[in-house]
From Swiss-Prot:
One of its GO terms (molecular function) is flavin adenine dinucleotide binding. This is Flavin-containing monooxygenase 3. Essential hepatic enzyme that catalyzes the oxygenation of a wide variety of nitrogen- and sulfur-containing compounds including drugs as well as dietary compounds. Plays an important role in the metabolism of trimethylamine (TMA), via the production of trimethylamine N-oxide (TMAO) metabolite. TMA is generated by the action of gut microbiota using dietary precursors such as choline, choline containing compounds, betaine or L-carnitine. By regulating TMAO concentration, FMO3 directly impacts both platelet responsiveness and rate of thrombus formation. Its cofactor is FAD. The chain crosses the membrane at residues 512-532. It comes from Cavia porcellus. Its main location: membrane. One of its GO terms (cellular component) is endoplasmic reticulum membrane. The keyword Endoplasmic reticulum applies. One of its GO terms (biological process) is taurine biosynthetic process. It is a single-pass membrane protein. The gene is FMO3.
Amino acid sequence: MVKKVAIIGAGVSGLASIRSCLEEGLEPICFERSNDIGGLWKFSDHAEEGRASIYKSVFTNSSKEMMCFPDVPFPDDFPNFMCHRKLQEYIVAFAKQKSLLKYIQFETLVTSVTKRPDFSITGQWDITTEKHGKKQSAVFDAVMVCSGHHVYPNIPKESFPGLKDFKGKCFHSRDYKEPGIWKGKRVLVIGLGNSGCDIAAELSHTAEQVMISSRSGSWVMSRVWDDGYPWDMLFVTRFQSFLKNKLPTAISDWWYVKQMNARFKHENYGLMPLNGTLRKEPVFNDELPARILCGTVSIKPNVKKFTETAAIFEDGTKFEGIDCVIFATGYTYAYPFLDESIIKSRNNETTLYKGIFPPHLEKSTFAVIGLVQSLGAAIPTTDLQARWATQVIKGTCTLPSVKVMMDDIDGKVGKNKKWFGQSETLQTDYVVYMDEIASFIGAKPNILWLFLTDPVLAVEVFFGPCSPYQFRLEGPGKWSGARNAILTQWDRTLKPTSTRIVGDLQKPYVFFHLFKLFTISILFIALFLMLI
């Protein structure tokens, strides 16, 4: 029996879900409220209600070899970190290559998703949609929610006394598009996340003065890592993940802080996190430290209160004559079409098994794709989630008991608070999470077997970048080109920067990095053992 699956949203997670449904012989129907695919990465010159919004100058934080769909590498000449136009070009090309567009109903808003009266038997859902004022209802065998979590802005105005008296402009970062209108102005950005830092750095070229107010600080990383290679090609590896999770906590914490401070000392710039050992997702910005050095951006603590024209900070200092306050304070996840009983929340924590399945449903026919966050790329994460979810919907894979799922959720919540902080309940360890999901569908690489049968590939898989191709080496959805894609990933990385050839291209020497990391680890294990 063909199962009809409703997919809500045609961003990257929606496209991954359509493709996975087709691979499993399911019948997908995707509802997209806008007139195009791409979701977050489809730029519009004005913010639209109910849609994610990005600014004109945004660039990806993951490099192309780490963020592609696992069987569709980016073209060789695409830059490693790309603007929204280039990424949208790739997304459209992927959708056309996989013939996904015909399964999407554009300009269609999902207004209601409810369990049918016989849900405990059939697992079916009633879905109501609206297009051009006309409502329609249909029955679906399963639902995959792919609407993202960058839609509903979080503006904690109640946390800032006096804000209602402030006479200048005040808006969320989702409404920011470009710096032109703020030329010569004095701007306060609240929030030290990716958007806040990008906007502040960009405004600092034309504004009179820019200040960033941060409650807790943040690590700021560069996209350019050791020897000029993309950060994630060296940072997100199985070997590093192994060391991070197996070394004593004191050594792992020291190593993490040392990596974060490799470019500059954060305490000297006012950026140092209150708890520097938390693995909270860092900010990626190549320009912010230079703008601080040049004096065009200043970092300040939390705002104590506002006056009509100024902000008074908790350290007693004041920023006067403010023209604009931009809240780069993140987003809240919300599903207005969904009854609150479907995705339950405890103490502001989402109770989803592996960040995907509500554990209490009688039938496993509902999945949320793309909600979890990690220090890794979104596209391969959503691709793997969708592959597992569609196998669960089809019945090829089964979920454990409610008790087992709740115990897993409780355990993850405790670990996440320890590793990522109280507020980062959706964060996860990228390599560990990807391997966990891959193991459910038989797609996790067998490293030991690879070392015995294909040592050249094994070295790249374990010590090199944990690139998406690894999760198409075996199992359902296996891609015959995965091995070659892994062995040639550095060629595609170096291609767009090699526009003036001055010698042989230098790929990173895996064993040099291995030796360096291994030596450091041994030295500190020895020191640790001497001290205990």
